[in-house]
Amino acid sequence: MAAAVSLWPRTEPLLLGALPVPPPARLGPHYLRKMAAYARARAAEGCYPRLSWPRWRHIACGKLQLGRGLAWLYFERFHDLLPPPDPPRRLQRAEAEAACGSAEELERERGKLSVDTLRFLLFLYLQQLNKASLRTSLIGEEWPSHRARAAGLPGRAAGQSKNWNDQDHLAFLLTHLSDMLELLLEPEQLGASSHATHNSLVSYEAVCALSFLIEGTVNNSRTIHPLHELALWQPCHGQNGYSKISKTFSFPKLENWLRSCLIINPFGMTACLRSGKKLAWAQQVEGTTRRAKIACNTRVVPEVSPMVIMSQVYKQTLAKSSDTLVGAHVRIHRCNESFIYLLSPLCSVTIEKCRNSTFVLGPVEASVHVHSCDNIKVITVCHCLSLSSTTGCTFHILTPTQPLILAGNQAISFAPFHTHYPMLEDHMAQVGLATVPNYWDSPMMVCKEGSDASVFRLLSPLDFYTFVIPFEMEGDTTETPGGLPHAYQKALNQREQKVQIWQKMVKEACLTKDQRKQFQMLVESKFYEWLIQTGNRQQLDSLVPPAVGSKQAAG
């Protein structure tokens, strides 16, 4: 009886590894095959089986014509995917980089890093996930199309995000499986055309590398295994062509076996939408037909990060610090005119098609990606921030990597992280994020479009105010981690001095009781006008009483 093996694409490499932007032309399959041959031929120089940063920098800048910043971006992004993040080691590395006093010292520190060559090749190939398809853009779809209806939670119809769509993940693997397998072959296993032949053999090391992308299970059990463990399982040898003598796999048999076993990820977004737990975190706002939808996949196996998908939160304040969010991949979609606080350590966050809202996020271990949003504010400590197709958005961030400005952005404002909540520093330690280095003010223009000035600016200290999180929680953090840059702290101090002078002037004015009452009414009236003009009135109205609010934040 045939072994009932099920395989599927792993979520993290495709969700977090593939940049949500078309890759440079020189990261195409042809050039990656050349890179694979080059790396194997220079094994003694630090190219294989592990590729050092100096050797990758040479290949990327000298052979592939990539900029140094982009070369480091790919290298670091992959380095942080494997092995699974180790918070103490990540903090140690951040401390070492922050201690570097010059660019030369920083390069020497980075020169200590290396990555698995074969897996890195697969990671570079993954960048094709978001490659623009000329055929698709020319053909388009018949209108009205079934996809256009975004009923329910955001699936393929609503989001069009390949990084978040496990159906696209499976389609990508099936379409490109042969190319990726060839990329892992030893040179002598390739034919004259640089492609595999019927007699080509795939090494065990190559299948181990492919475990970066594929995992699975046997007989639908809840135990997940990496691909190489399942490939070595005795009942599968007849199907995948494994030879115990040569410790290799037959290329055509292995490819056919993989294709026959690959399915959509049973723990991915599709499963979350179809059978995930619905969360009653949001309120139904009177006078609107929009109904907020929030769902999570139940944590059915320890190897799988939870997912939380949030859609159509409208005109309200939502605050949560919950075990459901810890280590979760969060997708926030079509949330408008709201204030959303997710005060837990998160794995990744994607914010799409949101308008006129504020998002306060707990520390994010991997990445925050913001796409197609207008007039939103994001406040977070995160490892990486990337932006595409945003307009008029402000980002108060603390991040050890350069914010990535992709395509289609306008009027972005960057500002220092300016808030705290009691558990913030504990949560930062859990995900391995420190206060240094901090590149909030040094974004990288990955997609060059016009002048930098038309795309982003640094918020003026004159327009800077601290942000207060209005919920009670237990914890030790009492101030913004790392403090504020000097210019911003100085602006706050000057503003505070003006308030003190004004208070002293009022105190010394010797007003009568009636005058004090009249003056108080005037101040309250002006304050009320300011609340309405700034939109803060809506936030205050949507806040629940403190006792219930504390439960909401903690529950």
Curated annotation (Swiss-Prot):
Keywords: Cytoplasm, Cytoskeleton. Transmembrane segments: none annotated. Signal peptide: none annotated. Its main location: cytoplasm. InterPro entries: C-CAP_CF_C-like, CAP/MinC_C, CAP_C_sf, CARP_motif, TBCC1, Tubulin-bd_cofactor_C_dom. SMART domains: CARP. This is TBCC domain-containing protein 1. It comes from Gallus gallus.
